[in-house]
């Protein structure tokens, strides 16, 4: 392609296995750019993260008569301007953290002729995009001193993603966590279990492991490694934080289902504890974390492993969110995570608490419905 004076772009959606933008081989191919169609913030971070000269976002809604779910878009009854603004809100918070070079639309351009409100909405979005792009050009946004590592089997290879769009993978708590993290003022990277064994935790403050027992996101048999458990235990004991969501570190065949139960202060009963009692507890409300109960799950077989574990939320007498001091660090557990503005704020406050930082840290809004980004070079709060 280059031999004929053309450029080669990857459209990252239709066929990508073996050509993951975060893979070691991607750069060697020599692509000139990456195009990613986006509904969500995590997809923007995925695109911007790739090492190519040009990053382009393809916005929704596509210029088609109907949308993916069959509802009218650019046809009678459609309100594409509302769709565009709704998706832009998710995209914008991620772009404030990491920029791309271009934005665009796909489909049949003539369909927009009868939808002037859509054209006006896109003009406004384009103006906002140019402003954000210029802010990044002048200098990077302020980031809190919080370094987060999302831990799963794939590590860096599947940075920011699971396999597809949000609506295709939204049964997994991790995609909700990725979406929340996409717009937060924290440093985020993705590591594998082998990375942990090779010293990856030396540049990390918080590790997040979220998934169901046996899946690649929780880790499955990777947790049979005593070296892995020992390294994470040391990390927390010396001052780090381990946040587990769903069935983190879960694998059968040991005295506890969660291999990190001693750090988390909570475990899940697989039916083998019928003759054991339960620690009594009261829900505590004095920690600086605003719990969003509706975003948490309702796992029925959770129990405390330690009477010193603080329960922040319980349903039907079962703990669903807990905090456990372990050495100089903390183990924090959530039974699930469903992204919304309130739960995103809950995650941010959890990260702040895990790192012993105040919830009223600089350049943060005290309103869960308002997110901010501060650009020191311009002395501008967006």
Residue ranges and their predicted role:
Residues 1-236, 244-255, 259-268, 324, ...:
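Glycan-processing catalytic domains of CAZymes
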